[in-house]
């Protein structure tokens, strides 16, 4: 019954636009109108509310306010769904003017940054906009008081004008740049296009800190200080406990930890697994009975190899889909025939089969990006998504041959060799020297592993 009521309230933008009329508005269907106070002039204006489903994303409430007395207008978006179990950071590299039309869903907690011009937009009102719309808002906000600054603070006026010119150069589409949306609620999104973005679009999920959970109201601020301290140090306690206990590969060890979603205590289960012809890895699973959060991770250990490793496998039939695969957090995965390109960090660490990994990719893309509500997509976009998902389904069912490329700069990933210890005729393994930039991103350039005790004691 609750689900049916929810479906009645939330309709797609296209359906709402087709069905809304003046009579329906008065009855509370479609767009709803509410009289509300104007914060500019103090008189009453009108707020319009639309409960809708964004095809690229999830259910939201679109709000638009207009005051007939002073002409003030305002629009914002609020999420109607719950806070996600993890935060998310989405990065997209803009190359041309067409990319500026990408849809952006930005929650009120999201921080937008463009490193090329050292721009960071803090969280404020939620927005349903485009990349160009975000840049336009920046220009509008900076231009508001420019006339008064020209007389009172000419130096500041010139500095802001110079920055506005930089933003306008990005708006023209002639200068490539990178935009990042970091949202601790996990409720923000940048539109992606399958088979076209390559390595330009990436998403990384992360666990929230205690401070972030407190900001979102997920932690009881009235709890004793010692409980907060215990919660804040739970992850460190888990690490110390894991290293202090002798791990038996035949047992599942359980440690007390903290749920990254609601910050309440829960149990983390850990098991040591020996992968033949590879190394020992740790599989960790967390389940929170309070909020239902679930997480499965694979951690590899040992020293960092001097070289990276790229594994290429020709998947010939359904039998190859049963091969075990360990994709570490630092590994990227590509399937050129499908136009599939997963950045390092996507899906986290996973130990499964090729079929299982493709199923996870399908579920993530279909549930997160593509849905049956495709009214805001162009026919070409719908066709591209349908073809991409169809090809992905054929690959996971063994109906088509493809090439799987697993590239890990830390050599912490694994792909099962059916012929081990002999070479696999359909698999090639290449070792390569990591570039300075890759080592910089991994934090290896400044890492000191020898005589650090002596250097640490210098004053």
UniProtKB/Swiss-Prot annotation:
It comes from the Eukaryota. GO terms for biological process: 'de novo' protein folding; protein folding. It is found in: Cytoplasm; Nucleus. A zinc finger (C4-type) spans 38-70, 259-291. It holds the Pfam family jr-ZPR1. Disulfide bonds: none annotated. The keyword Ribosomal protein does not apply. InterPro entries: Znf_ZPR1, ZPR1, ZPR1_A/B_dom, ZPR1_jr_dom, ZPR1_Znf1/2. GO terms for molecular function: protein folding chaperone; zinc ion binding. Keywords: Chaperone, Cytoplasm, Metal-binding, Nucleus, Repeat, Zinc, Zinc-finger. GO terms for cellular component: cytoplasm; cytosol; nucleus. Belongs to the ZPR1 family. PANTHER family: ZINC FINGER PROTEIN ZPR1. Acts as a protein folding chaperone for elongation factor 1-alpha. This is Zinc finger chaperone zpr1. It comes from Schizosaccharomyces pombe (strain 972 / ATCC 24843).
